């Protein structure tokens, strides 16, 4: 009988830890692109639906790591319990080829950091895939920190860990992502500072 109670407790823990919600704003379509998010900001000015609610519509979060609800007084959003969604992280290779490793932005110090870790522009595809894999896994497990929530949506920070190519060990650093509907996130900041 004790074994059965332990199993029940473990099953309850599994369901509780996988407990996700979706923000829903009645009568509005979710914004799947940054262009649609920007359009929602404009539409909010001519409607009675705020841009924050418009741009979090359809976004999914684990119950133990979600934005404060209600989002504001008189919020029309409601929460729907959902199964853990299929996660998808998007990271454009240009975040590395045209930003991190670009001589145009060399003064921000990010190119030097990645170079010190043994990475160069030729590694952009690898870095893109690594960021996607780690971000999907960590978002799925709720291993992220909520950031700014404003008229453009909810930002989150995810820690990425890379092996240094010159065998100095590993490096961990913050990356910035924007949350989109149905378990989608998109990289906005490929390097936001180191962590211990």
List PLM regions with ranges.
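Ribonuclease/tRNase effector modules and their secretory precursors
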Residues: 83-196
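Short glycine/proline-enriched turn or capping motifs at secondary-structure junctions
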Residues: 68-75, 181-187
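Domain-core detector
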Residues: 1-74, 80-125, 129-132, 136
């Amino acid at each position: 009988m004790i074994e059965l109670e332990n199993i029940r407790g473990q099953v309850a823990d599994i369901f509780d830890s996988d407990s996700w919600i979706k923000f829903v704003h009645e009568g509005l379509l979710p914004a799947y692109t940054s262009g649609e998010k920007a359009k929602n900001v404009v539409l909010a000015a001519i409607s009675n639906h705020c841009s924050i609610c418009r741009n979090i519509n359809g976004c999914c979060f684990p119950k133990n790591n979600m934005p404060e609800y209600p989002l504001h007084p008189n919020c029309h959003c409601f929460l729907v319990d959902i199964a853990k969604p299929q996660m998808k992280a998007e990271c454009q290779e240009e975040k590395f080829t045209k930003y991190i490793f670009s001589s145009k932005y060399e003064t921000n110090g990010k190119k030097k950091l990645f170079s010190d870790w043994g990475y160069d522009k030729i590694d952009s595809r690898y870095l893109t895939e690594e960021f996607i894999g780690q971000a999907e896994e960590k978002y799925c497990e709720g291993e992220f920190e909520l950031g700014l929530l404003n008229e453009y949506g909810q930002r989150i920070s995810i820690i990425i860990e890379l092996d240094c190519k010159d065998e100095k060990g590993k490096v961990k650093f913050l990356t910035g992502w924007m949350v989109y509907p149905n378990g989608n996130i998109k990289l906005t900041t490929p390097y936001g500072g180191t962590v211990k």
